[in-house]
Curated annotation (Swiss-Prot):
Name of this protein: Argininosuccinate synthase
Organism listed in the record: Nitratidesulfovibrio vulgaris (strain ATCC 29579 / DSM 644 / CCUG 34227 / NCIMB 8303 / VKM B-1760 / Hildenborough)
Cellular component annotations (GO), alphabetically ordered: cytoplasm
Broad class of where this protein is predominantly found: cytoplasm
Family: Belongs to the argininosuccinate synthase family. Type 1 subfamily.
Gene Ontology biological process terms in this record: argininosuccinate metabolic process; L-arginine biosynthetic process; urea cycle
Amino acid sequence: MSGIKKVVLAYSGGLDTSVILKWLAVTYNCEVVTLTADLGQEEDLDGVDDKAMRTGASRAYVEDLQEEFARDFIFPMMRAGAVYEGRYLLGTSIARPLIAKRLVEIARAEGAQAVAHGATGKGNDQVRFELAVNALAPDLRVIAPWREWDLRSRTQLNAFAEEHGIPISSSAKQYSMDRNMLHCSFEGGELEDPWNEPGPNSYVMAVPMEQAPDEAEYISIDFEHGNPVAVNGERLSPAALVKKLNSIGGRHGIGRLDMVENRFVGIKSRGVYETPGGTLIHIAHRDLEGICIDRETMHLRDAMLPRYAAAIYNGFWFAPEREAMQAMIDVSQQRVTGTVRLKLYKGNAWPVGRQSPNTLYCHDLATFEDCATYDHKDAAGFIKLQGLRIRGYKKG
């Protein structure tokens, strides 16, 4: 069909992508190669390659991409301080360009004519996958079965699976979940009513605040050029560091978010997110910037952040504007080296101390005590000049 002889499929091993695997082979009469990416989702991936092969794949890749994910995707985003709509730390969004990148690389190695994904026609992920492929390999076709087939319900998917001998899990999931080392998201079910409180099954990476310890914990995070490198003085690899902070933040109930967001496709959706380690990195990094980056550079970067965050959320990681913004951001991060001390208590994290060899904080200028460096009289001329523009503006 359409000259497609081989397709590379992003494969999780679940019902949807297992049905897609068989559907691709039957509908397109083609060879299907699968990619299962380990992004630190802490799922047991043993046997997922065997399941893919039994379902009809000609080859099954299961790849550990955790360090690349943390180093080349999470950390650049964290250096920018990216937050979508003022709240969301983009845990799902940032994973898609890496998966798409590997799909393209495997497609090239396998001589495939197309890649495929299991994202639905209502969500953002279809856009993210396909824009990434457009940027990296515009000659490859992208197949999105949810936009092509006639299967419209879970019952129909189960019937297709039974017809083709695909194993079906007996346990029904309460939520649609997506997890990687940075976060876990929950959608669907009772959450589709924005008035309903999330249930206990929406706690995976962080405990409810009521179950968090009754005593505060202090931790330190070290940064070099904007990247976190150590926790409590222990240097860790990027992936190990994120996981360490997930464990620390999670036990204090840190990083929970319940919000209604604006999808790129125009739909409002409710999501519940857990990002314990990412929240700690974000808070500490922002605080360290306060003593390392000058005012105008920081304000220029801050003005750009909504555009940067939207670029990631909307699927433009590989777009020239995101790369241009990243270049400016990374220049600003050259000075961001130092240590931040955080106090953690029942869902909250406060910076309580920071130090840097590149600090721009001057005690002699900031002190309320007598200071020979600063002459208070100089402020009068400064204020007078600043007032020229608005002088008389509101005069009756």
